[in-house]
């Protein structure tokens, strides 16, 4: 488990669970069947494994890559950088990449890894208004890394949140009261002719580079103040219908659902309609979907976390508050 702090550090905790069981007292009289001893509870041991230093400002977020790529951790900071960390041996992490100086011209506020099937890549957004993708040049984690901007002017005044969806599209939000959806432009097909063995090794990577041409697909308008977070729901039961949750300084949480008003298999011309989950009457900071995308957790400025679930009629109801 990784945590980050305004003290500029990242802490990685190695968690483990051990369970011990009780046995008879060995006194020769047999167990008291009527009043057996209570079972001993599981003991959870948590030890501070390591502290990662290197950021020169508060660290806002950390996020683990898919295990397919090994123990890779991304971090973003007020110091204008994204860093990639790799576990090189047990509880030992090395920094394998940092975005170049000047690549971001403001605090990097949020990061989101791509679903593993789209490669080893993480999206990041900054107070300078830009959205970027940092990706490994191969499917082998720890290989060469590169950074590229999706847009230098994604959100006026600044970008506050980013989420990489399972449809290989990126959602971002910002201080312009908007959520935006970014999709890859069409890549050209590879040329003909004979291919050497070396060409075969790099052909897939070259195709990936061609596909890294992102374009704005949709603007989602509904909030009246800064949008603080946006989160793409995991595909619910394998459904092709896309859902995005957004929350704002205006106190509202919206659920945006891709319209399904035509039979086209492409999403290029589809729109999104919104449903107001709730007006919390205070700023809403963060959102988090359950693994299957059917439950949404919401945290607000009243120090409350509430959990919401969609009913069969499309309305959202609160199921837990803590």
Language model: regions and residue ranges:
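WD40/WD-repeat beta-propeller blade N-cap
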Residues: 45, 52-59, 99-108, 151-159, ...
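C-terminal interaction modules of eukaryotic adaptor/scaffold proteins
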Residues: 270-322
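WD40-repeat beta-propellers
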Residues: 10-14, 62, 82-87, 111, ...
